[in-house]
Amino acid sequence: SIFSNIKMGKKTKLLFWNCHPLNLIPSLPGFRRLTASTSFLSKLILNTLLISFKLKSRNFLKLLERSKAILFMDGNNLNLSSELLKVKLSKPSFLPIPAKASSKLRWNKTLFKNSKSINFLWIGRIVDFKYFPLKRFLADLTEIQILKKIPVTLTVIGKGKFFDKFYEHATQNENVQLRFIDHIDLYDLDKFILENTDIMVAMGTSALEGAKLGVPTLLMDFSYKEIRGKYNYRWVHETKDYNLGCLINERNYKNNERTLLNKISEFQKSADSISLKELDYFEKNHNLSSVSNQLLDFVSESNCFFEELDSQRVFKKPLIYKFFYSIRKKILKNNFRSP
């Protein structure tokens, strides 16, 4: 089984939440970075080596739709799943990322009226798909500081496998004042954000940590490679279909009016208005209390049971996976034998 550690009764009701654009898309074991995209090569692999697994995933998605047992986190998840599996869902259902609302604390620009610089804050793990967006943001921030002489600071909260690589790159920057913090306790996070942030930069759940406080928050999309060309920045409240970060493709470059400089100009002119829009967007779409109620409704509507999926061998490990795991096992075994 794909999920060999999961044991459940035949009458167990199931509901699937697609939380990553490539969750339903087959990839080669050990080569996820190569196949985790919509590039020509990744599509070629999907439609040749992984064609049988692709068809299986396609049928699985259709089954879940019929059973009202599939939810998508956002439009990006839905669109990429539909595009790569060639499935058009008639009535897709969304369950957005939730976050617990802050009871009293709210962002206020007057807290920074005496500040001579614009203080940016990044929160998030620094891993493969977040490294390149963060690197690109620092490059854009540096360009603005040099050309427009706008004093800026960037605080980075987070660690990860790509932290050392980013730190080495960032510390060569002599234009942007940088500060690195490994971790801040969750109970202290709201207070820290409010006291240290003009503009927050993040993706996913981290972006909601700013929006729920009314902090003007720029969304970053994710990428497994360098980001070229003019990047399209947007506030959280400007996003569509609950997207809090998309897999970068040509659509991210269509609107060249959304440069980082333009967003900074908007902030300088109407920060309080942006703040109210961020907070309103969060309350309407991502507040934990409302999202949890939606989840309960979706659970009651699901007609999917483990017995049906098991009988159709949905969880059976694909042949291509067995082959790759066998080869990898032999390679590792031979390496251990080497002197």
Question: Where are each of the predicted segments found?
Answer:
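Nucleotide-activated donor-binding/catalytic signature segment of Leloir-type glycosyltransferases, i.e.
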Residues: 165-185
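A short, active-site helix/loop in glycosyltransferases that binds the activated sugar's phosphate group
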Residues: 46-92, 101-104
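Membrane-proximal basic amphipathic "stem/tether" segments
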Residues: 29-61, 305-339
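Catalytic binding pocket for nucleotide-activated donors in carbohydrate/polymer assembly enzymes
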Residues: 206-268
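A charged, aromatic-enriched C-terminal amphipathic alpha-helix characteristic of glycosyltransferases
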Residues: 250-319
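Conserved catalytic-core segment of nucleotide-activated headgroup transferases in glycan assembly
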Residues: 100-165
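Active-site proximal beta-strand in glycosyltransferases
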Residues: 7-48, 71, 92, 219-220
